[in-house]
Design a protein with these regions (language model features):
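RecB-family 4Fe-4S metal-dependent nuclease core
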Residues: 1-357
Length: 357
C-alpha cells in the first residue's frame, strides 16, 4: 500500500488484499473530535479556563479534561508569583523589608536566572514606590488583597477567581489586577467570550455598579522602551504604571482616585477638560454598561458550561477580523491537525483596545 500511495507501484498482492478488505481510504485521517461522555457532572470555570474554551473547545478539553503532564514551571511564572506575593505584603504593610520578603522566596541557582532576578527585583521595587505615590493621591482608606471568590450559578455550574487588590473608600470600590506580561484587553472580543478578565472581576464581586470607581490592570514589568527625547526613563515608567481599563463616568467617584485636573496621573486614557467635563478620549463606562457587562459574563459562563456538560469539545479555533486569536500561542497546535473547515470566523466593528498585562 505504501508503494502504491507514494510511487504508484501496483503489487500483485493488492488484488487479493482488496478482495478481503475492500478499497478503504488508506492514508486519510479524520481530525475531528468524536463526542463521547467524559463523565463531567459539574463545571467550575475561571476566567482563564473560560478563555481557553472560547478560544477553542478542544484546547479546553486538553487543558482541563485530559490534563497532559506539564510540570515545567518557567522562570517568568515563578518571578511573577514572587512579585505578586511581595506587593501584597508591602501594600498591606509598607514598613516591611522589601529585600527580606523577596529574597526569602527566591530559589534560583543559575547565573542567568540570578541576573534577571536582580533586574526584575529592582524594577518591582520601583513599581511599589509608584504604587505608594498613586495611593497618596487618592482618598482610599482601606485595601483588600488576594480576594478569592467562588460563585454558584446552578447546582452544577460554578465560577471562581481571585482579585489582586480592591481599594475601598466607604462604599466605593476600585479593582486592580497586577500583570507581568503584555496583554491588551480588547473589548471588541467580549461578545465572543474572549478577553473577559476585567468584566469577570465585576461579576465576581457581585456589587452594585454605582459603587464601582473603576476596574483595571496594572503592568509591573516595563516593555521595551522606544526612545523619545521628550521623556526620560522615569517618566515612561510612571506612564507604564498607570492603571489601564475602565473608569466610571461619574466624576465624583473619579475624584476618589485623585483630584482630577487635566490628564490623570494614575489612570491611562482619563482626562478632564478646562470646563470640568471628561475628555472625549477618556475610557469611561456608565453604570448601565457595567450591568450589561456583568450580564454578558454570566451568559458566557452558562453557555460554555452547558457545552462542556454536553461533551462538546470540537476543534474550533477563532479568527476575528482576519486575525487568528486562538492558535498563535497554543501549545497543542501541532497535534490537533486543524483544517480550514474547523475555523470559526467572526467580524467586529469596534476597534478599541485597552492596554493591559
Amino acid at each position: 500500500m505504501d508503494n502504491l500511495d507514494k510511487y504508484g507501484e501496483h503489487n500483485d498482492d493488492l488484488d487479493s488484499m482488496y478482495s478481503t478488505y475492500d478499497r478503504n481510504n488508506y492514508g486519510d485521517y479524520d481530525n475531528s473530535y468524536k463526542r463521547f461522555d467524559v463523565n463531567k457532572k459539574e463545571v467550575c470555570l475561571s476566567y482563564s479556563s473560560m478563555q481557553s474554551y472560547y478560544e477553542c473547545a478542544f484546547k479546553y478539553y486538553l487543558d482541563n479534561i485530559l490534563r497532559p503532564d506539564d510540570s515545567d514551571v518557567t522562570f517568568f511564572n515563578t518571578i511573577g508569583t514572587i512579585a505578586h506575593n511581595v506587593l501584597q505584603e508591602m501594600v498591606l504593610d509598607n514598613t516591611k523589608d522589601f529585600d527580606v520578603l523577596w529574597d526569602n522566596q527566591v530559589t534560583f541557582t543559575s547565573a542567568k536566572e540570578s541576573y534577571f532576578n536582580k533586574k526584575i527585583k529592582e524594577e518591582i521595587r520601583e513599581d511599589f514606590n509608584i504604587i505608594l505615590n498613586q495611593k497618596e493621591l487618592s482618598y482610599f482608606d482601606d485595601v483588600e488583597c488576594e480576594k478569592r471568590i467562588k460563585l454558584k450559578l446552578r447546582d452544577n455550574i460554578f465560577f471562581k477567581g481571585f482579585i489582586d487588590k480592591i481599594l475601598k473608600c466607604k462604599d466605593n470600590l476600585c479593582i486592580v489586577d497586577y500583570k507581568t506580561g503584555n496583554t491588551k484587553i480588547e473589548d471588541k472580543y467580549f461578545e465572543f467570550g474572549l478577553n473577559l478578565q476585567l468584566p469577570s472581576y465585576l461579576y465576581l464581586l457581585q456589587e452594585d455598579p454605582s459603587k464601582i470607581i473603576g476596574f483595571y490592570l496594572q503592568h509591573l514589568v516595563a516593555p521595551k522602551y522606544v526612545y523619545d527625547e521628550k521623556k526620560d526613563i522615569e517618566t515612561q515608567k510612571n506612564e507604564d504604571m498607570k492603571l489601564s481599563g475602565f473608569t466610571s463616568n461619574d466624576i465624583s467617584r473619579i475624584n476618589i482616585l485623585e483630584d482630577l485636573d487635566g490628564k490623570s496621573s494614575v489612570v491611562s486614557k482619563l482626562a478632564i477638560t478646562k470646563n470640568g467635563d471628561l475628555s472625549k478620549n477618556s475610557k469611561v463606562i456608565a453604570d448601565e454598561d457595567m450591568k450589561d457587562m456583568i450580564k454578558l459574563v454570566e451568559d458566557k459562563i452558562l453557555e460554555a458550561s452547558t457545552s462542556i456538560l454536553n461533551n462538546d469539545f470540537s476543534i474550533n479555533p477563532k479568527v476575528i477580523d482576519n486575525k487568528n486569536v486562538s492558535c498563535i500561542y497554543c501549545r497543542y497546535k501541532d497535534i490537533c491537525y486543524k483544517r480550514l473547515k474547523d475555523y470559526v470566523y467572526y467580524e467586529t466593528k469596534k476597534e478599541e483596545a485597552v492596554d493591559g498585562d
